[in-house]
């Protein structure tokens, strides 16, 4: 079939909770992709974690067949369900590169949110034809006309032919399918040209080995053919090709314009670089397709097993997750306080939480997580440049020329009654206002903020100030020089490397006092006095003392000479002095996490 006019490849883009996965469910149901008895909510969110949190983490693909009412032809629709959260923007960019058009789903009661904007701009950059869809028009609070105007004002899309639907009840789903067929362009490609297929995603299946998700641009991928990975130069014979309906369905071949999966008995996903081009080993394509820009981990934290004998299990588990999620990185590290573990890099905080939860769930591990930090650039006096992932490793200030930290461009959309508090929060976090515009009763503020300031609990604070109405999206902009210092935390005069952090000099004293105060409440009392100190270099900037537990050694003295009591008390004093010298202070796991939260709410 060299005619590609019957194929439509499209993605669904939306903010979290605007009904993207529900719409995908309805499209699958309407096109008969799944029998009624197999139908379940969020059909494409295959991970338990995705279903529980109601978010999409991995992009999924489905092939559907739809007979158009307008011309009676049967069309092949390839749907990519994409994540909506800012941390998974990388997954979104890959999905968009594999499609020619998108459905933009906007909640008719809530309107355009910050992440809708980010994903729409990505789709426009990818050259997509975009169909606006207003979801949840059956809600009493829905205001379709106002939201249409907002889409035109904020994004600049024509909404005169936007489709109003209710994904929950299935209202007007057929109109969405008609719009897909009539308004989206078919893919371009030549079946007879040398094979070129874009590797969109890959994951590891314990029975099948590595499953590769591809979008064929030119030529054909057939069973039995030898495929060549252009980036790595590896050659593998293809065992199976097929499509998802959403179940796996084997076919003989995948030709230009189609999406599907390929299996070739590959054991390691390291051989499958996402964004690579697959071609026929016997008649390779002259050049590779443009890939994706590599995702760069933004947030780093240490993961340590509670039981040190689990170290190897943790290593294997991380390697397995890396198979499915090429966007996170890890390297071994050791800590005096926590033993051996790994320093892991993530795309953002939600990504970090998800990976940690998957490790605990899928591999049964008990983990200690250190505070998240960002990557600082250390410019040394001898002209070298160091990238610092762990605050505990910060070099001696004498050897430092200057330090740079990453800044982000953050877009915040918020109802205007909460704007004042939101702007105050951004200023408190060293933000620089770049833009402030209004669309109806919502304001859109654009700020430059240091990533270090938002990485911890900025999102939580934003939500609590705005009663959950604000939405937030950011992209890493660039590095800028800052006056940063390392604050060490000493417990019983011993530095605890896992609690060290880097802060701006103006905030170091305040943060140090805050953390010492918290640790005083979090560390249980011992039989001797425990001093907790925060220090910059050799200068102590804050101190708290945990009082000793008192054991009443004179309880068994009834009356008699006072010197008898004094002797016992002196003996106890000597013992406590010795204990203070050699005693070990136990710091509970909860102290590591709670001590480093920025705010007290």
From Swiss-Prot:
One of its GO terms (cellular component) is plasma membrane. PROSITE patterns: G_TR_1, G_TR_2. Keywords: Cell inner membrane, Cell membrane, GTP-binding, Hydrolase, Membrane, Nucleotide-binding, Protein biosynthesis. InterPro entries: EF-4, EFG_III/V, EFG_V-like, G_TR_CS, LepA_C_sf, LepA_CTD, LepA_IV, P-loop_NTPase. It catalyses: GTP + H2O = GDP + phosphate + H(+). It is found in: Cell inner membrane. It is a peripheral membrane protein. Residues 5-188 form the tr-type G domain. Gene3D superfamilies: 3.30.70.240, Elongation factor 4, C-terminal domain (3.30.70.2570), Elongation Factor G (Translational Gtpase), domain 3 (3.30.70.870), P-loop containing nucleotide triphosphate hydrolases (3.40.50.300), Translation factors (2.40.30.10). It holds the Pfam family LepA_C. GTP binds at residues 17-22, 135-138. GO terms for molecular function: GTP binding; GTPase activity; ribosome binding; translation elongation factor activity. One of its GO terms (biological process) is positive regulation of translation. Its EC number is 3.6.5.n1. It comes from the Bacteria. HAMAP family: LepA. Required for accurate and efficient protein synthesis under certain stress conditions. May act as a fidelity factor of the translation reaction, by catalyzing a one-codon backward translocation of tRNAs on improperly translocated ribosomes. Back-translocation proceeds from a post-translocation (POST) complex to a pre-translocation (PRE) complex, thus giving elongation factor G a second chance to translocate the tRNAs correctly. Binds to ribosomes in a GTP-dependent manner. PANTHER family: TRANSLATION FACTOR GUF1 HOMOLOG, CHLOROPLASTIC, TRANSLATION FACTOR GUF1-RELATED. Belongs to the TRAFAC class translation factor GTPase superfamily. Classic translation factor GTPase family. LepA subfamily. This is Elongation factor 4.
